[in-house]
């Protein structure tokens, strides 16, 4: 991976020397999100493809910490965690088989479990970046308690690469539940809103919830958990 990293640094410095815009790309599953526009090298733009820079750098199941490169497919990371009975605390949407860890953190999309578990940024322990000058910067570490100043690593969640291209991310992971169940309860919209308010004040292991209308004139529907 040292060769891939060297190539990425060279691409950044070449784009900087030529005063060319540099666009960071990954699996391409979140092209709809943010200020996106289609670009190609033929347009005079430089594309920094992060997908070759992939793989799990370190994983300590006993410490509930994993560090992986930005181009690592989310499916690959989640499978590695599942082998040890663990998972990501948040629930990042994949939007396709090419979804990567770097894109997950850069977009900051936490999925339906955000309300109960927390956001992406709450579980970022450390990060390595490639800045606009081709320098590699490191922030945070692999522990929850970081007293080294402002936690720049968590600032990367949702930043969409404006501070630099994510190279590696260290995340806190959590034990995987032994059983997951889905429930569907008949309810009107008013009942659903009342229930949601009550449930939020209790320590219930609800990862996601929604209300769907059934189209009936009486305003009926169902709560799905």
Predicted regions and their residues:
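Short secondary-structure capping/turn micro-motifs that flank functional sites
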Residues: 31-32, 97-98, 215
């Amino acid at each position: 991976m040292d060769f891939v990293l060297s190539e990425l640094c060279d691409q950044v410095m070449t784009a900087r020397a030529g005063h060319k815009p540099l666009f960071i790309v990954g699996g391409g599953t979140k092209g709809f999100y943010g200020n996106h526009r289609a670009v190609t090298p033929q347009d005079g733009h430089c594309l920094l493809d992060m997908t070759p820079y992939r793989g799990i750098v370190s994983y300590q199941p006993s410490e509930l910490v994993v560090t992986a490169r930005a181009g690592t497919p989310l499916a690959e990371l989640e499978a590695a965690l599942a082998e040890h009975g663990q998972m990501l605390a948040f629930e990042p949407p994949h939007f396709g088989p090419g979804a990567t860890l770097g894109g997950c953190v850069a977009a900051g999309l936490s999925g339906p479990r955000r309300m109960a578990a927390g956001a992406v940024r709450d579980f970022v322990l450390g990060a390595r970046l490639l800045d606009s000058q081709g320098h590699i910067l490191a922030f945070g570490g692999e522990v929850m308690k970081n007293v080294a100043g402002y936690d720049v690593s968590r600032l990367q969640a949702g930043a969409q690469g404006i501070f630099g291209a994510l190279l590696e991310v260290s995340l806190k992971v959590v034990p995987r539940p032994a059983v997951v169940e889905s429930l569907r309860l008949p309810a009107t919209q008013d009942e659903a809103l009342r229930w949601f308010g009550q449930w939020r004040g209790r320590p219930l292991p609800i990862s996601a919830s929604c209300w769907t209308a059934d189209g009936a004139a009486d305003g009926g529907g169902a709560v799905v958990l």
